[in-house]
């Protein structure tokens, strides 16, 4: 990995600024490797990735932004370039990594760059009667108004709220609260609790994602962070009712439109299970631990054991809901066995009374 990063950086080749798949992810992984091993080469690699992330930014308006190839062109067929602004593939995710780099003492420039990123995001926010919202790109080439964590206002709001903790700039907190108020207007009642629609284009809404990307396990992170910052219990009550909406679908045994044959951290069971464990830690409510155990049992029932001598296990899953028949045995963290294994280890540590999970930059939860 380090060789790959150095090679790409030397050639000044493009790598996306997606927090889970591009330069920001390398900043995080390499710095964590440095912390674990004290080998300076990993710290240098993290700084290299951070430098390349910044080099790909453009001065736009009141801050900085990133112009990249249109995301998901392999699915939509739409090509070209756009300014990407969301958490998963855009500026908000890059901003979160700048905050991480600042807190880790990697760069004196990291916080000023996070501020420039946020100032551009404030500039491109869409004003609505219900509050502020952000889309995946500033100029969407296809209809996709997603209010949740990965590609919508919940993710951008999370970054702005987190930045407020470092700057005490009320403009960031006010924008984050406005984003949360907007999300609250996109809920749909379930038999118990409520869920937020996947996209606003679907009318009436019938698809409700449950995972981190567009479901309670992601948007709940935003609400929990607001609760931590403001100490306003309405945000915690909201995420609890939102989780009740998730449970009311019959998950994980019942697979709804928003919980298809995907078991990973991003869209599926592993991310939901981790979220349940964090809620258990916060509330001591045994229902969350019981739900995490149900998730684990379902994952075990869905795994495929190799007949080879290594006795490996894997999960055949569809990364994209729109292509359920295109399954792969993925190995990554957000999509694949690494993320599923991480949840199972997390659950084991909780059951043993010594909860352990490496804190991620896009999560307000930690045991440290």
Locations of the language-model features?
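Glycan-recognition and catalytic cores of secretory/periplasmic carbohydrate-active enzymes
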Residues: 1-368
């Amino acid at each position: 990995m380090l060789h790959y990063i150095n090679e790409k950086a030397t050639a000044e080749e493009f790598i996306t600024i997606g927090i889970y798949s591009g330069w920001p992810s390398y900043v995080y992984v390499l710095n964590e490797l440095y912390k674990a091993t004290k080998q300076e080469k990993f710290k240098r690699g993290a700084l290299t990735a951070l430098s390349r992330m910044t080099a790909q930014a453009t001065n736009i308006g009141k801050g900085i932004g990133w112009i990249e190839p249109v995301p998901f062109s392999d699915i939509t067929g739409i090509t070209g370039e756009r300014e990407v602004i969301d958490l998963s593939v855009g500026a908000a995710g890059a901003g979160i990594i700048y905050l991480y780099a600042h807190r880790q003492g990697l760069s004196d420039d990291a916080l000023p760059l996070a501020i420039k990123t946020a100032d551009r995001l404030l500039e491109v926010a869409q004003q609505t009667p219900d509050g502020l919202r952000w889309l995946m790109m500033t100029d969407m080439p296809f209809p996709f108004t997603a209010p949740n964590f990965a590609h919508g206002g919940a993710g951008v709001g999370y970054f702005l709220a987190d930045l407020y903790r470092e700057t005490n700039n009320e403009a960031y907190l006010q924008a984050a609260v406005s984003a949360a108020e907007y999300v609250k207007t996109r809920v749909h009642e379930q038999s118990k609790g409520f869920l937020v629609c996947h996209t606003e284009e679907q009318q009436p809404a019938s698809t409700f994602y449950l995972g981190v990307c567009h479901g309670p396990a992601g948007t709940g992170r935003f609400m929990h962070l607001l609760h931590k910052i403001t100490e306003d219990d309405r945000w915690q009550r909201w995420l609890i009712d939102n989780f009740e909406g998730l449970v009311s679908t019959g998950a994980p045994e019942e697979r709804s439109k928003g919980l298809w044959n995907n078991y990973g951290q991003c869209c599926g069971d592993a991310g939901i299970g981790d979220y349940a464990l964090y809620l258990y830690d916060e509330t001591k409510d045994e229902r969350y631990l019981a739900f995490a155990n149900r998730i684990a049992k379902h994952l075990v029932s869905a795994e495929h054991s190799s007949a080879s001598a290594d006795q490996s296990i894997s999960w055949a899953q569809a990364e994209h809901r729109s292509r359920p028949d295109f399954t792969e045995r993925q190995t990554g963290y957000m999509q694949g066995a690494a993320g599923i294994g991480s949840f199972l280890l997390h659950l084991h540590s909780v059951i043993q009374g010594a909860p352990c999970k490496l804190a991620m930059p896009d999560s307000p939860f930690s045991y440290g």
